[in-house]
């Protein structure tokens, strides 16, 4: 107990000056720790940038969770068992990427050339053919890919069934307008189409009761080998984690620069 009393007395007599007097190096570093004075203009420049970077990083994290949910929902829809395509267009439009079946007769003379595209390094087109169901409704079917040299239908007549058919594939919704500004305009007069525009395709083919969705046929082989189905691209780009890391890194870098700038100013004084 006597030792504890002596220790308390020693600590009571101790002060910052005596501590640093025994350690000159600490005296030199004291201004760096206690003399930090944020300056107005550097702060007005740095703080908004840090807040912006942190906000954008947080937004990318939210986008990451959204994209992961979208990917999971798509995979779940694709892996589910096929169902008959609903006759209610509104119901069917809520089933994008679900596997569906449809029955009807192909209107081969009204097929649409969707391109230019490529498969395995070969340039060509995707063939969208109207399918007339027993109800009279028209559903466009993306039957798959053909090489450019088979654009003439006479070179692939074997792959054009004339009677009732059953098709299975993924229900798809067309884009709302041009997917991006890099695509050329569709040319219905030349049967050159660069994105799916079902209302315009219906007008070009003089068709009525066209469904507001289409079907990507699966990879079941067609007679003659063409078209080759199964062209749906299911993968989604998901770079949000990298983007978030970039924004957070920029925020940290700006904080470091801000602190070092003020430390330099303190040292110079």
Give the positions of each predicted feature.
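Short, low-complexity intrinsically disordered segments enriched in A/P/G/S/L with frequent Arg
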Residues: 12-16, 21-24
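Localized chelating/binding microdomains
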Residues: 6, 25
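Cationic, low-complexity basic patches in intrinsically disordered or flexible, solvent-exposed regions
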Residues: 9
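Cysteine-centered motifs
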Residues: 3-4, 14
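Surface-exposed, charge/polar-rich loops and edge strands
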Residues: 30-89, 93, 97-269
């Amino acid at each position: 107990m006597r030792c504890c009393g002596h220790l308390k007395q020693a600590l009571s007599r101790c002060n910052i000056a005596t501590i640093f007097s025994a350690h000159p190096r600490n005296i030199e570093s004291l201004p760096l720790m206690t003399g930090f004075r944020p300056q107005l203009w550097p702060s007005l420049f740095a703080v908004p940038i840090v807040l912006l970077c942190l906000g954008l990083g947080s937004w990318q994290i939210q986008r990451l969770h959204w994209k992961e949910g979208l990917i999971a929902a798509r995979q779940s829809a694709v892996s589910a068992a096929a169902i008959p395509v609903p006759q209610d267009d509104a119901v069917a439009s809520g089933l994008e990427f679900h596997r569906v079946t449809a029955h009807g007769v192909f209107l081969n003379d009204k097929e649409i050339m969707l391109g230019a595209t490529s498969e395995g390094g070969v340039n060509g087109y995707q063939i969208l053919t109207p399918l007339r169901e027993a109800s009279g409704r028209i559903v466009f079917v993306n039957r798959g890919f053909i090489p450019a040299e088979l654009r003439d239908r006479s070179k692939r007549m074997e792959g054009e069934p004339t009677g009732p058919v059953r098709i299975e594939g993924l229900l798809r919704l067309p884009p709302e307008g041009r997917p991006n500004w890099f695509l050329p305009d569709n040319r219905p007069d030349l049967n050159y189409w660069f994105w799916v525009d079902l209302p315009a395709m219906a007008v070009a083919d003089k068709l009525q009761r066209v469904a507001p969705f289409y079907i990507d046929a699966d990879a079941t082989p067609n007679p003659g080998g063409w078209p080759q189905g199964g062209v749906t691209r299911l993968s989604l780009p998901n770079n949000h984690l990298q983007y978030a890391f970039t924004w957070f890194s920029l925020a940290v870098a700006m904080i470091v620069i801000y602190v070092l700038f003020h430390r330099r100013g303190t040292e110079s004084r």
